């Protein structure tokens, strides 16, 4: 047999012998990855050749060829290609020696470009550092059952959703019991945005968003689920039934001017807050014009003493109630929408049986939606016609330009070293200085509803007793309408200088404040969500001061 082998080697071309060397190396690397076999020492024995009934141990000549190949390929993680390898020829991977020869190892081996196994002696079960952080969430079932909660199984989907809006703690209970690893890793909260779809006939709520926030790095992901297990209701037409829930409430055809003279965003927020104050505590900023300042009639903010921004008074101005059916039913506003550009307000109400009413009325709850038009609009083309304006007092400006951010630029302008007599101010700190010096003006010549008897500002100033209108977290306002104003709202700051006859200089500043005007989705407004494009109200502000 040895003679036959030597004869074979003498006949074969060199490329074929190199091929045998590569096969040997691949087999050795494969062996090294078997946890139940002790790896061979490279210099102790020759390479292992897969067993074949017609083959025996190769000769020393072949051994030397293999050892030369091993000098590169036997190194862990080596990516050095075999120079003698002919890429045009297909290569068949030898079977991996195992206890059962009938089960070949089909995984790519060695430095095969298709090999996705760990290199550098990394074990196959070692965690992948590039693994998706939220991979465990992607494996969650997309249906969550409420069948084990008697409170919810006795409620139809619409009623259940209403309760979830006020108390979403049940989702934590569910995950703490069914997915403890997820509960331990993430903070879990409902993110109800008004886009949920209730189906009382199937007893489910679709498109429910749940937010998972990693407790360590605070990264979060929102996933949509379908909640199931609620009471199934087969509705029957009840248009002819005088006791129908649909007959309980209707919208008024004409709304009092003292309400439509307000911006719809203010009305929407106050309806939701005064109905469930605890749900909006985290949105409030203290020592500013917030929910509490607006809840009851505030003569410092409104000229009409009859304006009362609580849910009972507001619903009475918007809706007509059948008082007889009021003995059977109760109602609750579960979502609102507003559009300050077009003066629109939307209400979504849930109508339920009163506890004592269990015989006369049908068992299912009903949702009614109403849209109102004719509310006050933001005039984007004529900013001066709006209730809100901003003022930069001269004294504030004169003090501000003593700061080095402005002082250095003024000196350059005075020196005449640059051709133009104005300069663009780009420093972020300049925006901060301007922001804290701006005052708010509330003037309502059209309807005489809004008014301010106190000095308002964007930033609280206890020294001068200024009160900020930013009553919502994140720089949000409620009064006179909902918007968001911060340092980044200030744009295009230009500083100008002119020499006066009395050897003084007139320094002027001009800039814009971009105020976003929103149209919301239908939601409970516990978070900020808009629909469509945001419109921008641009306020142009100029002031000046004389300096030496």
From Swiss-Prot:
Keyword Cell membrane appears in the UniProt entry: yes
InterPro entries: Mycoides_lipoprot_LppA/p72
GO cellular component: a single term: plasma membrane
Signal peptide residue numbers: 1-24
Covalent lipid adducts (S-diacylglycerol cysteine), residues: 25
Bias-annotated ranges (Low complexity): 58-78, 110-128
Compositionally biased residues, Basic and acidic residues: 34-44, 83-109
Top-rank taxon: Bacteria
Lipid-acceptor residues (N-palmitoyl cysteine): 25
Membrane topology: Lipid-anchor
Localization of this protein: Cell membrane
Region (Disordered): 26-129
Keywords, sorted A to Z: Cell membrane, Lipoprotein, Membrane, Palmitate, Signal
Similarity-based family: Belongs to the mycoplasma p72 lipoprotein family.
Protein name as annotated: Uncharacterized lipoprotein lpp
């Amino acid at each position: 047999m040895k003679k036959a082998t030597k004869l074979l080697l003498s006949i074969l071309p060199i490329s074929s012998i190199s091929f045998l060397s590569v096969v040997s190396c691949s087999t050795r690397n494969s062996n090294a990855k078997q946890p139940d076999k002790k790896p061979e020492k490279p210099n102790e024995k020759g390479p292992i050749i897969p067993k074949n009934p017609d083959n025996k141990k190769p000769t020393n000549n072949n051994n030397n060829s293999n050892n030369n190949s091993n000098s590169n390929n036997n190194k862990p993680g080596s990516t050095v290609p075999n120079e003698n390898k002919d890429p045009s020829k297909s290569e068949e991977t030898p079977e991996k020696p195992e206890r059962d020869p009938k089960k070949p190892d089909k995984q790519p081996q060695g430095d095969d470009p298709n090999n996705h196994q760990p290199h550098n002696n990394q074990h196959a079960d070692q965690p992948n550092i590039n693994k998706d952080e939220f991979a465990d969430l992607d494996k969650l079932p997309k249906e969550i059952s409420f069948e084990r909660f008697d409170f919810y199984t006795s409620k139809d989907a619409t009623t259940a959703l209403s309760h979830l809006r006020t108390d979403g703690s049940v989702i934590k209970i569910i995950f703490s019991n069914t997915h403890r690893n997820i509960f331990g890793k993430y903070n879990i909260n409902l993110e109800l945005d008004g886009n949920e779809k209730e189906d009382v006939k199937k007893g489910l709520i679709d498109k429910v968003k749940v937010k998972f926030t990693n407790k360590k790095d605070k990264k979060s992901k929102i996933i949509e689920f379908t909640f199931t297990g609620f009471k199934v209701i087969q509705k029957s037409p009840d248009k002819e039934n005088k006791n129908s829930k649909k007959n309980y409430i209707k919208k008024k055809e004409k709304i009092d001017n003292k309400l439509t003279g307000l911006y719809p965003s203010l009305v929407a927020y106050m309806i939701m807050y005064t109905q469930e104050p605890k749900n909006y505590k985290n949105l409030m900023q203290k020592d500013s014009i917030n929910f509490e300042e607006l809840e009851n009639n505030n003569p410092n903010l409104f000229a009409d003493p009859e304006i009362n921004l609580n849910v009972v008074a507001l619903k009475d101005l918007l809706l007509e109630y059948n008082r007889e059916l009021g003995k059977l039913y109760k109602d609750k506003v579960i979502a609102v929408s507003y559009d300050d550009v077009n003066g629109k307000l939307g209400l979504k109400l849930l109508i339920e049986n009163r506890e004592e009413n269990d015989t006369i009325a049908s068992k299912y709850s009903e949702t009614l939606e109403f849209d109102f038009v004719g509310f006050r609009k933001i005039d984007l083309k004529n900013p001066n016609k709006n209730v809100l304006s901003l003022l930069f007092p001269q004294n504030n400006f004169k003090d501000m330009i003593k700061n080095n951010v402005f002082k250095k630029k003024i000196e350059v302008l005075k020196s005449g070293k640059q051709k133009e007599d104005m300069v663009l101010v780009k420093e972020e700190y300049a925006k901060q200085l301007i922001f804290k010096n701006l005052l708010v003006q509330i003037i309502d010549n059209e309807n005489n509803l809004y008014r301010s008897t106190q000095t308002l500002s964007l930033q609280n100033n206890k020294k001068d007793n200024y009160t900020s209108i930013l009553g919502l977290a994140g720089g949000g306002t409620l009064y006179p309408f909902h918007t968001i104003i911060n340092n980044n709202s200030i744009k295009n700051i230009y500083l100008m200088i002119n020499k006066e006859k009395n050897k003084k200089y007139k320094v002027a500043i001009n800039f814009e404040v971009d105020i976003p005007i929103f149209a919301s989705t239908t939601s409970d407004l516990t978070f900020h969500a808009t629909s469509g494009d945001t419109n921008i109200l641009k306020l142009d502000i100029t002031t000046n001061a004389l300096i030496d």
